[in-house]
């Protein structure tokens, strides 16, 4: 059985026992999280929500919080002796999917 959930403005296809990386959640490592915005549940039969399916949740456990690799941007203006270098590291949360409650 699989489900498509929505969190952090993105959609993820998940199955029980799968680890996913999502946008940063406020939960700490070891805490349980519940995703209630389930868009689709598939398996023997497929159920599609409009926009969400009522009464269906996906449970998971936060494994760790982290930050992705640095992305460097560089702006340069020729003949002006002007340049700007910036770096950004996006925070993420690693979640282990425990169960799909359909």
From Swiss-Prot:
A Pfam family that the UniProt record links to this protein: Ribosomal_L21p
Keywords: Ribonucleoprotein, Ribosomal protein, RNA-binding, rRNA-binding
GO terms for MF: rRNA binding; structural constituent of ribosome
InterPro entries from the UniProt entry: bL21-like, bL21-like_sf, Ribosomal_bL21, Ribosomal_bL21_CS
Superkingdom classification of source: Bacteria
Oligomer and partners: Part of the 50S ribosomal subunit. Contacts protein L20.
Family to which this protein belongs: Belongs to the bacterial ribosomal protein bL21 family.
HAMAP family: Ribosomal_bL21
Main function: This protein binds to 23S rRNA in the presence of protein L20.
Name of the protein described by the UniProt record: Large ribosomal subunit protein bL21
Organism (species): Latilactobacillus sakei subsp. sakei (strain 23K)
Lineage start: Bacteria, Bacillati, Bacillota, Bacilli, Lactobacillales
Gene (UniProt): rplU
């Amino acid at each position: 059985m699989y489900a498509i959930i929505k969190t952090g403005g993105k959609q993820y296809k998940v199955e029980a026992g799968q680890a996913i990386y999502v946008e940063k959640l406020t939960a700490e490592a070891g805490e349980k999280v519940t995703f209630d915005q389930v868009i689709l549940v598939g398996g023997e039969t497929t159920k599609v929500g409009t926009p969400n399916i009522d009464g269906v949740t996906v449970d998971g456990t936060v494994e760790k919080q982290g930050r992705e690799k640095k992305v460097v941007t560089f702006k340069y203006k020729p003949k002006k002796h002007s340049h700007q270098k910036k770096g950004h590291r996006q925070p993420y949360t690693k979640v282990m999917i425990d169960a799909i409650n359909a």
